[in-house]
Amino acid sequence: MSNAWQDVSQVYGGCSFFAAWGEATGSGGMLVGRNLDYAGLEQLAGFQSINFYKPETGYRFVTVNYPSMVGIMHGMNEKGIVIAKAYSTVVPEETTVDGVPFTIMLRHALQYGGSVDEVVNIIKNTPRTVGLNILVADAARREAVVLEVSAYRMTVRREDSARANFIYSANRFLTPYLKEYQEPGWLSSAFREARFEKLKQAFSSELKVEDAVRILRDKEVEDPDSPALLPSIQNNATISSMVFDPVRLELWVSAPGGLLTTDQVFTGISASEVWRTGQPPSPVGFIPATETTPVVRAWQQVMTAAGASDQRKKELLTPVVERYPAAGYPLYLLGVACLRTGELQAGLGYLEQCVISANLPDPYYLLAAHAWLGVAYDTLGRREQALQHYRAGLAVELWEEVDPMVLQICQ
């Protein structure tokens, strides 16, 4: 069950990944960055390990994994193939438990796939279970694609241009074919995709491992004096981060421990040296921890608060919004926490501040704040104010299909 519970329960996490190659890396190499966003595994995150496999058949491979798991969610083999997955929720008709658990499928693909085409064929011919975005990168061909799959459908997404050298994914399908079968849900995919687009331009040439780590650590802090302090490529569910260099057969991994470890030291390891010598790995280098500036410290505090109790949210977020009164996401979290604990006036104040004057780049939170304000004003018998917020919520232009509950409240 350790390798099938995600398929059976259909409990979805987040995750982001990207691959860059050719001119994007300056040296003509290839780098793959991957954030594992899965707060449900946080208790296991402290037991994170780097596992090297030398199977009797197939290719040797390496993965970052957790106790009892023999399948993989990401990894690299000796042929320079890298695989990483991200959930992409699909309608119930496109899922089944009558298939191979996806972690076992991905292990099989990594163990026996020596090229993009071979991996694609393995996944195509494997009975699948759930919706996924699967990155497949091939160092030999300097090529990377994203497989968008459900239990019964599959398509291969490539970059549009023949000169393209950067591809990414979050938790939604981008091809028209699979979009038709997407289950509405909100995991900030569009926002993270927008961040990848911006960072792709910022690191348009000579991308190095250090730069790949900076992308994985992205917090959307464009203006340190007026930050939004909201989840980005790194977020409150990120429990592990890694960069694969399949040309050199190296991987760089964040420290074990779970939440916020992406900001800790990354350790570089040569898989080729382990496979050559059969000896335990020695670090080939380190990437320093994120500099803890005031805005980084505030962002980390907000991410910690996001998964905390309402009382703890209030303790953590009150000083943050005092220092950054235009930071929309902590205002939203604090306002909701106050409403839930019976502090209606305080909650209304924070949420009104959130919708009127806050920096809130992801429009979903604006919709949600209006919905909460409508419910709160209805609770107080102030129907006209409630209706104003319901209407304002319905007028928000969303970037992606969201969980219908918040929209239904406004409707």
What are these regions (language model features)?
Residues 1-14, 110, 114-144, 152-154, ...:
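C-terminus-biased signal that marks the final domain/tail of proteins
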Residues 1-101, 129-133:
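A contiguous strand-loop segment
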Residues 34-36, 66-67, 86-87, 139, ...:
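Fold-independent oxyanion-binding glycine-rich loops
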Residues 95, 105-109:
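Second-shell loop/turn segments in exported
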Residues 327-330, 356-367, 395-409:
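Boundary/linker segments of alpha-helical solenoid repeat arrays
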Residues 374-385, 410-411:
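Alpha-helical linker/edge segments of TPR/alpha-solenoid repeat scaffolds
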